[in-house]
Amino acid sequence: MKRKGFKFKKEVQDNMKKLLSLALATVMALGLVSCGNSSSGGNSATSGSAASGSASGADWPTKSINIVVPWSAGGDTDFHARTLGQYLEKELGVSVTVVNTTGGGGSVASTEVKNSDPDGYTFLAFDTAMALNHASGITDFGGEAFDPVAIIGKSCGEFLVTQGDAPYDTIPELIEYTKAHPGEVRMAANTGATSYYAAIKLSEQGADLNIVNSGSSSERVAALLCDQINLSVNAYGVIGQYIETGDLKILGCLATERSETYADVPTAVDQGVDLSYDLIYNLLAPKGTDPAIIEKMSEACQKIIEEDSSYAEAIATSYGEKPFYMNSSEAVDFLKGEDDMYMEYADLFQAKS
Protein backbone atom coordinates (compact mmCIF):
# COMPACT_ATOMS: atom_id res chain seq x y z
CA MET A 1 0.00 0.00 0.00
CA LYS A 2 1.32 3.42 -0.89
CA ARG A 3 2.14 5.66 2.01
CA LYS A 4 0.73 9.15 2.06
CA GLY A 5 3.73 11.19 3.12
CA PHE A 6 3.11 14.92 3.45
CA LYS A 7 0.42 16.42 1.25
CA PHE A 8 -0.61 19.87 0.11
CA LYS A 9 -3.76 21.53 1.35
CA LYS A 10 -6.80 20.24 -0.49
CA GLU A 11 -7.77 23.68 -1.81
CA VAL A 12 -4.59 23.98 -3.88
CA GLN A 13 -4.43 20.45 -5.28
CA ASP A 14 -6.94 20.83 -8.11
CA ASN A 15 -5.23 23.98 -9.35
CA MET A 16 -2.12 22.04 -10.42
CA LYS A 17 -3.64 19.26 -12.49
CA LYS A 18 -3.89 21.06 -15.81
CA LEU A 19 -0.37 22.50 -15.53
CA LEU A 20 1.18 19.16 -14.58
CA SER A 21 -0.54 17.29 -17.39
CA LEU A 22 0.77 19.80 -19.91
CA ALA A 23 4.26 19.80 -18.41
CA LEU A 24 4.67 16.04 -18.41
CA ALA A 25 3.13 15.80 -21.88
CA THR A 26 5.74 18.28 -23.10
CA VAL A 27 8.57 16.22 -21.62
CA MET A 28 7.31 12.97 -23.09
CA ALA A 29 6.59 14.56 -26.47
CA LEU A 30 10.16 15.80 -26.64
CA GLY A 31 11.40 12.31 -25.83
CA LEU A 32 13.37 13.54 -22.84
CA VAL A 33 12.65 10.48 -20.71
CA SER A 34 11.73 7.00 -21.86
CA CYS A 35 10.47 4.60 -19.21
CA GLY A 36 12.58 1.49 -19.01
CA ASN A 37 15.43 2.95 -21.05
CA SER A 38 18.15 5.45 -20.25
CA SER A 39 17.99 8.63 -22.28
CA SER A 40 19.50 12.06 -22.48
CA GLY A 41 18.35 15.27 -24.05
CA GLY A 42 20.69 17.52 -25.93
CA ASN A 43 20.39 21.25 -26.36
CA SER A 44 16.84 21.98 -27.41
CA ALA A 45 17.69 25.25 -29.13
CA THR A 46 20.15 28.03 -29.45
CA SER A 47 19.23 31.54 -28.50
CA GLY A 48 18.38 32.63 -32.00
CA SER A 49 19.22 36.20 -31.07
CA ALA A 50 18.54 39.00 -33.48
CA ALA A 51 21.22 40.49 -35.68
CA SER A 52 23.88 42.35 -33.77
CA GLY A 53 23.66 46.07 -33.22
CA SER A 54 22.88 48.25 -30.26
CA ALA A 55 19.33 49.29 -29.54
CA SER A 56 18.53 52.79 -28.38
CA GLY A 57 16.68 52.96 -25.11
CA ALA A 58 14.50 55.72 -26.51
CA ASP A 59 12.81 53.54 -29.15
CA TRP A 60 13.33 50.07 -27.66
CA PRO A 61 11.83 47.58 -28.34
CA THR A 62 11.26 47.51 -32.07
CA LYS A 63 11.48 43.76 -32.71
CA SER A 64 11.08 40.36 -31.10
CA ILE A 65 12.75 39.65 -27.76
CA ASN A 66 14.32 36.29 -26.86
CA ILE A 67 14.39 35.01 -23.28
CA VAL A 68 16.82 32.11 -22.97
CA VAL A 69 16.04 29.48 -20.32
CA PRO A 70 18.77 27.01 -19.24
CA TRP A 71 16.34 24.15 -18.63
CA SER A 72 13.96 22.18 -20.83
CA ALA A 73 10.27 23.01 -21.15
CA GLY A 74 7.91 22.08 -18.34
CA GLY A 75 9.97 23.07 -15.29
CA ASP A 76 9.60 25.90 -12.82
CA THR A 77 12.14 28.34 -14.31
CA ASP A 78 10.67 27.75 -17.75
CA PHE A 79 7.17 28.36 -16.33
CA HIS A 80 8.20 31.71 -14.85
CA ALA A 81 9.86 32.84 -18.07
CA ARG A 82 6.92 31.80 -20.26
CA THR A 83 4.29 33.27 -17.99
CA LEU A 84 6.12 36.58 -17.63
CA GLY A 85 6.86 36.57 -21.37
CA GLN A 86 3.16 36.37 -22.22
CA TYR A 87 2.48 39.47 -20.15
CA LEU A 88 5.56 41.28 -21.45
CA GLU A 89 4.23 40.91 -24.99
CA LYS A 90 1.18 42.92 -24.01
CA GLU A 91 3.19 45.44 -22.02
CA LEU A 92 5.97 46.02 -24.58
CA GLY A 93 4.02 45.49 -27.80
CA VAL A 94 6.45 43.00 -29.37
CA SER A 95 6.65 39.23 -29.43
CA VAL A 96 8.62 37.50 -26.67
CA THR A 97 10.06 34.08 -27.47
CA VAL A 98 11.29 31.67 -24.80
CA VAL A 99 14.22 29.58 -26.02
CA ASN A 100 15.27 26.48 -24.06
CA THR A 101 19.05 26.07 -24.31
CA THR A 102 19.99 23.14 -22.09
CA GLY A 103 23.25 21.58 -20.95
CA GLY A 104 26.02 21.97 -18.43
CA GLY A 105 23.72 22.45 -15.46
CA GLY A 106 22.55 25.72 -17.00
CA SER A 107 26.01 26.95 -17.96
CA VAL A 108 25.51 26.54 -21.72
CA ALA A 109 22.68 29.07 -21.69
CA SER A 110 24.31 31.48 -19.26
CA THR A 111 27.57 31.49 -21.23
CA GLU A 112 25.68 32.00 -24.48
CA VAL A 113 23.77 35.01 -23.17
CA LYS A 114 26.86 36.43 -21.44
CA ASN A 115 28.60 36.44 -24.82
CA SER A 116 25.60 37.78 -26.76
CA ASP A 117 25.38 41.28 -28.19
CA PRO A 118 24.03 43.67 -25.55
CA ASP A 119 21.39 44.86 -28.00
CA GLY A 120 18.37 44.62 -25.71
CA TYR A 121 16.84 41.64 -27.49
CA THR A 122 18.42 38.70 -25.68
CA PHE A 123 17.84 38.01 -21.98
CA LEU A 124 18.53 35.13 -19.62
CA ALA A 125 15.91 33.76 -17.22
CA PHE A 126 17.83 31.76 -14.63
CA ASP A 127 17.59 30.91 -10.95
CA THR A 128 19.71 30.20 -7.87
CA ALA A 129 21.60 27.55 -9.86
CA MET A 130 23.66 30.31 -11.47
CA ALA A 131 25.43 30.94 -8.16
CA LEU A 132 25.85 27.19 -7.68
CA ASN A 133 27.35 26.88 -11.18
CA HIS A 134 29.97 29.40 -10.12
CA ALA A 135 30.68 27.76 -6.76
CA SER A 136 30.97 24.34 -8.40
CA GLY A 137 33.52 25.55 -10.93
CA ILE A 138 31.24 24.90 -13.90
CA THR A 139 31.51 28.58 -14.76
CA ASP A 140 34.02 31.22 -13.75
CA PHE A 141 31.36 33.90 -13.35
CA GLY A 142 28.25 34.75 -11.38
CA GLY A 143 25.68 37.51 -11.56
CA GLU A 144 28.40 40.14 -11.88
CA ALA A 145 28.95 39.03 -15.49
CA PHE A 146 25.51 40.38 -16.45
CA ASP A 147 23.40 43.48 -16.14
CA PRO A 148 20.58 42.27 -13.87
CA VAL A 149 17.12 43.39 -14.93
CA ALA A 150 15.10 42.15 -11.98
CA ILE A 151 14.39 39.36 -9.55
CA ILE A 152 11.11 38.10 -10.98
CA GLY A 153 10.01 35.45 -8.50
CA LYS A 154 10.64 33.44 -5.38
CA SER A 155 9.69 29.79 -5.07
CA CYS A 156 7.42 28.82 -2.21
CA GLY A 157 9.92 26.04 -1.66
CA GLU A 158 11.46 22.99 -3.28
CA PHE A 159 10.51 19.57 -1.97
CA LEU A 160 12.38 16.33 -1.47
CA VAL A 161 10.21 13.80 -3.29
CA THR A 162 10.16 10.03 -3.70
CA GLN A 163 7.88 7.26 -4.95
CA GLY A 164 4.63 6.80 -3.06
CA ASP A 165 5.56 3.29 -1.91
CA ALA A 166 9.10 4.12 -0.72
CA PRO A 167 9.93 2.61 2.70
CA TYR A 168 10.57 6.02 4.32
CA ASP A 169 8.26 8.95 5.01
CA THR A 170 10.56 11.63 6.42
CA ILE A 171 14.06 12.90 5.72
CA PRO A 172 15.56 11.33 8.88
CA GLU A 173 13.98 7.99 7.91
CA LEU A 174 15.51 8.36 4.44
CA ILE A 175 18.97 8.98 5.89
CA GLU A 176 18.71 5.95 8.17
CA TYR A 177 17.47 3.78 5.29
CA THR A 178 20.45 4.73 3.11
CA LYS A 179 22.84 3.86 5.92
CA ALA A 180 21.37 0.36 6.01
CA HIS A 181 21.17 0.15 2.19
CA PRO A 182 24.24 2.06 0.96
CA GLY A 183 24.06 3.28 -2.63
CA GLU A 184 20.61 1.81 -3.21
CA VAL A 185 18.70 5.10 -3.33
CA ARG A 186 19.30 6.92 -6.61
CA MET A 187 19.00 10.68 -6.25
CA ALA A 188 18.83 12.95 -9.28
CA ALA A 189 21.18 15.89 -8.83
CA ASN A 190 22.68 18.13 -11.46
CA THR A 191 26.14 19.46 -10.70
CA GLY A 192 25.87 23.17 -10.02
CA ALA A 193 22.13 23.13 -9.30
CA THR A 194 20.06 23.28 -6.11
CA SER A 195 19.48 19.54 -6.33
CA TYR A 196 23.27 19.06 -6.13
CA TYR A 197 23.48 21.29 -3.07
CA ALA A 198 20.71 19.24 -1.45
CA ALA A 199 22.49 15.97 -2.25
CA ILE A 200 25.74 17.21 -0.72
CA LYS A 201 24.02 18.43 2.43
CA LEU A 202 22.23 15.09 2.83
CA SER A 203 25.52 13.25 2.33
CA GLU A 204 27.17 15.43 4.97
CA GLN A 205 24.57 14.19 7.43
CA GLY A 206 25.14 10.53 6.76
CA ALA A 207 23.00 9.71 3.74
CA ASP A 208 24.67 7.14 1.47
CA LEU A 209 23.16 8.05 -1.90
CA ASN A 210 23.79 7.02 -5.49
CA ILE A 211 23.80 10.47 -7.10
CA VAL A 212 22.90 10.52 -10.79
CA ASN A 213 22.34 13.27 -13.34
CA SER A 214 18.77 13.26 -14.59
CA GLY A 215 18.16 16.58 -16.29
CA SER A 216 15.63 19.33 -15.63
CA SER A 217 12.84 19.48 -13.08
CA SER A 218 10.22 18.05 -15.42
CA GLU A 219 12.59 15.31 -16.56
CA ARG A 220 13.21 14.32 -12.95
CA VAL A 221 9.48 13.92 -12.32
CA ALA A 222 9.18 11.70 -15.38
CA ALA A 223 12.18 9.67 -14.19
CA LEU A 224 10.59 9.24 -10.75
CA LEU A 225 7.35 8.04 -12.30
CA CYS A 226 9.31 5.55 -14.40
CA ASP A 227 11.31 4.33 -11.37
CA GLN A 228 14.56 5.38 -13.03
CA ILE A 229 15.43 7.33 -9.88
CA ASN A 230 14.18 7.20 -6.28
CA LEU A 231 14.70 10.71 -5.01
CA SER A 232 14.39 14.18 -6.48
CA VAL A 233 14.16 17.85 -5.60
CA ASN A 234 11.25 19.62 -7.26
CA ALA A 235 9.15 22.75 -7.04
CA TYR A 236 5.50 22.78 -6.06
CA GLY A 237 3.90 23.04 -9.48
CA VAL A 238 5.80 20.10 -10.96
CA ILE A 239 4.77 17.45 -8.42
CA GLY A 240 1.37 18.35 -6.96
CA GLN A 241 -0.78 16.17 -9.18
CA TYR A 242 1.29 13.09 -8.41
CA ILE A 243 1.24 13.74 -4.68
CA GLU A 244 -2.55 13.78 -4.86
CA THR A 245 -2.70 10.46 -6.74
CA GLY A 246 -0.19 8.84 -4.38
CA ASP A 247 2.31 8.08 -7.13
CA LEU A 248 4.80 10.35 -5.36
CA LYS A 249 5.15 11.59 -1.80
CA ILE A 250 6.96 14.42 -0.05
CA LEU A 251 9.61 13.80 2.57
CA GLY A 252 10.00 17.47 3.45
CA CYS A 253 10.28 21.05 2.25
CA LEU A 254 13.76 22.48 1.70
CA ALA A 255 12.86 26.18 2.06
CA THR A 256 14.19 28.28 4.91
CA GLU A 257 10.71 28.53 6.42
CA ARG A 258 7.23 27.12 5.93
CA SER A 259 4.79 28.84 3.61
CA GLU A 260 1.08 29.15 4.24
CA THR A 261 0.55 27.28 0.97
CA TYR A 262 2.00 24.08 2.42
CA ALA A 263 1.84 24.75 6.15
CA ASP A 264 1.31 21.06 6.90
CA VAL A 265 4.59 20.06 5.26
CA PRO A 266 7.57 20.31 7.66
CA THR A 267 10.84 21.75 6.45
CA ALA A 268 14.04 19.73 6.63
CA VAL A 269 15.14 21.95 9.51
CA ASP A 270 11.87 21.19 11.32
CA GLN A 271 12.91 17.54 11.08
CA GLY A 272 16.34 18.20 12.55
CA VAL A 273 18.18 18.11 9.22
CA ASP A 274 20.59 20.92 8.31
CA LEU A 275 19.35 21.64 4.80
CA SER A 276 17.60 24.84 3.71
CA TYR A 277 17.73 27.36 0.88
CA ASP A 278 15.49 29.72 -1.06
CA LEU A 279 15.06 29.41 -4.81
CA ILE A 280 14.99 32.76 -6.61
CA TYR A 281 14.20 33.43 -10.29
CA ASN A 282 16.02 36.24 -12.07
CA LEU A 283 16.10 38.03 -15.41
CA LEU A 284 19.49 39.14 -16.76
CA ALA A 285 20.88 40.97 -19.77
CA PRO A 286 24.34 40.80 -21.36
CA LYS A 287 26.85 43.18 -19.81
CA GLY A 288 26.85 46.56 -21.54
CA THR A 289 23.13 46.70 -22.33
CA ASP A 290 21.84 50.28 -22.48
CA PRO A 291 20.76 51.27 -18.94
CA ALA A 292 17.60 52.80 -20.40
CA ILE A 293 16.65 49.38 -21.79
CA ILE A 294 17.35 47.72 -18.45
CA GLU A 295 15.15 50.30 -16.75
CA LYS A 296 12.30 49.88 -19.25
CA MET A 297 12.37 46.10 -18.99
CA SER A 298 12.59 46.20 -15.21
CA GLU A 299 9.68 48.62 -14.95
CA ALA A 300 7.60 46.45 -17.29
CA CYS A 301 8.32 43.43 -15.06
CA GLN A 302 7.44 45.42 -11.97
CA LYS A 303 4.12 46.56 -13.40
CA ILE A 304 3.17 42.98 -14.29
CA ILE A 305 4.38 41.35 -11.08
CA GLU A 306 3.14 43.94 -8.61
CA GLU A 307 0.00 45.27 -10.29
CA ASP A 308 -1.52 42.63 -12.58
CA SER A 309 -3.97 40.50 -10.60
CA SER A 310 -4.26 37.93 -13.39
CA TYR A 311 -0.49 37.36 -13.27
CA ALA A 312 -0.66 36.94 -9.51
CA GLU A 313 -3.47 34.43 -9.96
CA ALA A 314 -1.49 32.51 -12.59
CA ILE A 315 1.56 31.96 -10.38
CA ALA A 316 -0.57 31.22 -7.32
CA THR A 317 -2.67 28.68 -9.19
CA SER A 318 0.26 26.88 -10.81
CA TYR A 319 3.02 27.16 -8.21
CA GLY A 320 1.43 28.41 -4.99
CA GLU A 321 3.57 31.54 -5.11
CA LYS A 322 3.04 35.18 -4.26
CA PRO A 323 4.35 37.96 -6.52
CA PHE A 324 7.98 38.78 -5.76
CA TYR A 325 10.01 41.52 -7.43
CA MET A 326 13.32 43.33 -6.95
CA ASN A 327 14.48 46.09 -9.28
CA SER A 328 17.80 46.15 -11.09
CA SER A 329 19.90 47.74 -8.35
CA GLU A 330 18.36 45.48 -5.70
CA ALA A 331 19.02 42.48 -7.93
CA VAL A 332 22.71 43.41 -8.22
CA ASP A 333 23.08 43.35 -4.45
CA PHE A 334 21.00 40.21 -4.02
CA LEU A 335 22.87 38.21 -6.65
CA LYS A 336 26.22 39.19 -5.15
CA GLY A 337 25.07 38.05 -1.72
CA GLU A 338 23.77 34.77 -3.13
CA ASP A 339 27.00 34.17 -5.02
CA ASP A 340 29.11 34.95 -1.95
CA MET A 341 27.06 32.56 0.19
CA TYR A 342 27.47 29.56 -2.11
CA MET A 343 31.14 30.33 -2.82
CA GLU A 344 31.76 29.46 0.83
CA TYR A 345 31.01 25.86 -0.21
CA ALA A 346 33.21 25.98 -3.34
CA ASP A 347 35.86 23.57 -2.06
CA LEU A 348 33.23 21.03 -1.05
CA PHE A 349 31.27 21.35 -4.30
CA GLN A 350 34.35 20.98 -6.46
CA ALA A 351 35.69 18.06 -4.43
CA LYS A 352 32.41 16.21 -5.05
CA SER A 353 32.26 17.05 -8.77
What are the functions of these language-model segments?
Residues 1-66, 352-353:
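Short, low-complexity disordered leader/linker segments with a strong preference
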Residues 239-312, 337-340:
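C-terminal lobe and pocket-closing loops
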Residues 54, 115-120, 135-219, 280-314:
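Hinge/capping helix and adjacent helix->loop/strand transition within the periplasmic-binding protein
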Residues 62-64, 204, 289-353:
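An extracytoplasmic/periplasmic, membrane-proximal ligand-sensing/linker region
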Residues 43, 48-144, 184, 191-195, ...:
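N-terminal (or domain-start) structured segment
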Residues 125-130, 189, 216-217, 234-239, ...:
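Beta->alpha turn/N-cap motifs
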Residues 72-74, 128-129, 163-168, 189-194, ...:
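Short coil/turn segments
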